[in-house]
Structures are given as structure tokens and as C-alpha cells.
Amino acid sequence: MMYHIPDVLSADQVAEFTRQLAQAEWVDGRVTVGNQGAAVKQNQQIDTRTPLYARLQAAVLDALRGHPQFFSAALPRTISAPLFNRYGPGETYGFHVDGAVRQNAEAGWMRTDLSATLFLCDPESYEGGELVIEDTYGQHRVKLPAGHLVLYPASSLHCVTPVTHGVRQASFLWIQSMVRDDKQRATLYDLDRTIQSLKARFGDGEEVLSLLNMYHNLLRQWTEV
């Protein structure tokens, strides 16, 4: 399943990110991928050895950890250190699949259940640069407002189409979920959204508490911690 998570960053936060990204040191994006990815990757990434990178990735992690919809959809056990990329005119990233495991400074090796892209530019500010994700239903072209995030299975083939005008900037990261199975995780997400909607309309009635009990029993059955 693919999810659009709105307003991970506020407009003020996006403006601050834009200001700081203008001061960043950028390096060839191929330094973070293997041979398969390097053959189709043409972009730039922020140098992860700089103090600016440390501040930006910490800000993204704080925003994600405080976003209820992201937590409900991802059920994160481990979140990788966010990276930041930039695509200028002519730059692109051809179809590829993300590696199944990654090294993480805090957790050692982590399994990549989910991939996420947090858009940092308004879609009107650049042309091209769509994130294209393939699944069993076909191709999905994603180009979200600044501060919004797309979350999708890391097993999906995906690409970034060539930017033809302007600059596309984003943060990207991976999540190891407490619930490994995509269908089980989607069931829990749908159930949680239903519970939250019913609570907003009717309060904590008997039926809502029954669904909440069901949610936690399923989570207890399916989770890996």
C-alpha cells in the first residue's frame, strides 16, 4: 500500500529547510548506492559529514516521531537516518529497487520494510521530477506539496523522472516496521483510522472500545519487537 502523509513539516519549517539547504555542501548521489543503483542515478546529496546535515536529519526524525498518521501507517521499529537529495535539470534516477537491509548507526543492521520521500519543494517550482512507484495495480506518479510525505513498500520498483526545469529537493529514508507483513500493517492502519473517526464522532463508546481491543490484540499477534 502507498500512503500520502500530509503536513509532516509546517510551512514555516519548510521555509527554514529551504534556507538551510541553500547553504548545504552537496556531493555526487552515487556515493550511497551499490553498482545497480549507481548505473541509473544522477543527482546530488548533502554531505553526511557536516554539522548542517546532522541538524536537518534530526529535525526530520523529530517531525516523523511526532506525527500520529505516520506512526499509524508505518508502525516504526527503526527509522534510518534521513538523507537529502537534489535534482537539477537533466538529473534523474532510473528504475531500481532499494536494498533489503541497511546499516543504521543506532540499530546496526535494519530491514527496509518501507521507503519514504518527504518533499521539500512546492511542485510548481520544478518540472519533471515525479516519483514513479510500480505495484500490482500499475504505476503511480507522485509529486506532493512541500512538507508532505509518501510512504510505500521498499520492495517496489521506483524511479525519479528527469527534472526539466527548476530544482527538486527532498529527504528520503527507510523504516523497519514492528509489523513486517504489508497486508497486516495495512489492516491495522485501516482499523486505526476507523477507530479515530468513530471516536471523533461518538466518543469512547462500547463499540469503539471493542474495536480498540481488537486493534491491540492484532498488533500483539503480528508485531515483532
UniProtKB/Swiss-Prot annotation:
PROSITE patterns: FE2OG_OXY. Pfam families: 2OG-FeII_Oxy_3, PKHD_C. Its cofactor is Fe(2+); L-ascorbate. Binds 1 Fe(2+) ion per subunit. Residues 78-177 form the Fe2OG dioxygenase domain. The keyword Oxidoreductase applies. GO terms for molecular function: 2-oxoglutarate-dependent dioxygenase activity; iron ion binding; L-ascorbic acid binding. It is an enzyme of class 1 (oxidoreductase). It comes from the Bacteria. 2-oxoglutarate binds at R168. Transmembrane segments: none annotated. Keywords: Dioxygenase, Iron, Metal-binding, Oxidoreductase, Vitamin C. InterPro entries: Oxoglu/Fe-dep_dioxygenase_dom, PKHD_C, PKHD_hydroxylase, Pro_4_hyd_alph, Pro_4_hyd_alph_FE2OG_OXY. Its EC number is 1.14.11.-. One of its GO terms (biological process) is DNA damage response. Fe cation binds at H96, D98, H158. This is PKHD-type hydroxylase KPK_3192.
